[in-house]
């Protein structure tokens, strides 16, 4: 999105529909794909309240995710994302929904582990961090730096770190119970 003041009035201005979405008519596109992706995102599951009825959070944790809530869902980031537009990878949710998942995954009260979904369902590995989504964001959200990169780091640590894999394989309760170690003799 651009301000009208940056254009010269003696040149024609080209307006076109969002390229990624199926074209219906004129500037109208079919946005149903966005709603389908959104339905796959599990909602926030907060930790239970403490005995005094409160939920304690650090202010810095709250401020970190508030940036993500500025999104107005204009889908310009989805339109400019070359993974969605050019490669048409169906397994990639796109920057808008990675922002939404980041707002949930980084919420101080969320109890769900969203890493497997990020990897398998939403295809975070397809993002090659070109920052084109950040450049077009009308709300100046640092999509790549504050959401996508931290999520990719979490996924990499959980699934591709050899030391973490070794630790999980040695301490996995499910593997131990399959071997009969959970039985009391």
Give the positions of each predicted feature:
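Hydrophobic/aromatic-rich structural module bridging two neighboring secondary-structure elements via a short loop
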Residues: 1-19
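Ferredoxin-type iron-sulfur electron-transfer modules in oxidoreductases and energy-metabolism complexes
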Residues: 13-185
């Amino acid at each position: 999105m651009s301000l009208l003041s940056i254009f010269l009035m003696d040149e024609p201005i080209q307006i076109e529909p969002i390229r990624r979405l199926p074209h219906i008519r004129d500037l109208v596109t079919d946005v149903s794909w966005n709603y389908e992706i959104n339905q796959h995102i599990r909602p926030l599951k907060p930790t239970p309240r403490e005995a005094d009825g409160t939920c304690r959070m650090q202010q810095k944790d709250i401020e970190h995710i508030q940036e993500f809530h500025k999104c107005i869902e204009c889908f310009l980031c989805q339109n400019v994302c070359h993974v969605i537009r050019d490669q048409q990878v169906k397994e990639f949710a796109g920057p808008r929904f990675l922002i939404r998942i980041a707002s949930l995954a980084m919420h101080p009260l969320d109890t769900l582990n969203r890493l497997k979904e990020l990897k398998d369902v939403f295809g975070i590995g397809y993002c090659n961090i070109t920052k084109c989504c950040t450049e077009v964001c009308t709300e100046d959200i640092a999509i790549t730096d504050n959401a996508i990169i931290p999520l990719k780091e979490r996924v990499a640590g959980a699934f591709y770190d050899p030391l973490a894999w070794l630790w999980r394989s040695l301490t996995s309760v499910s593997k131990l119970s399959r071997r009969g170690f959970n039985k009391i003799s």
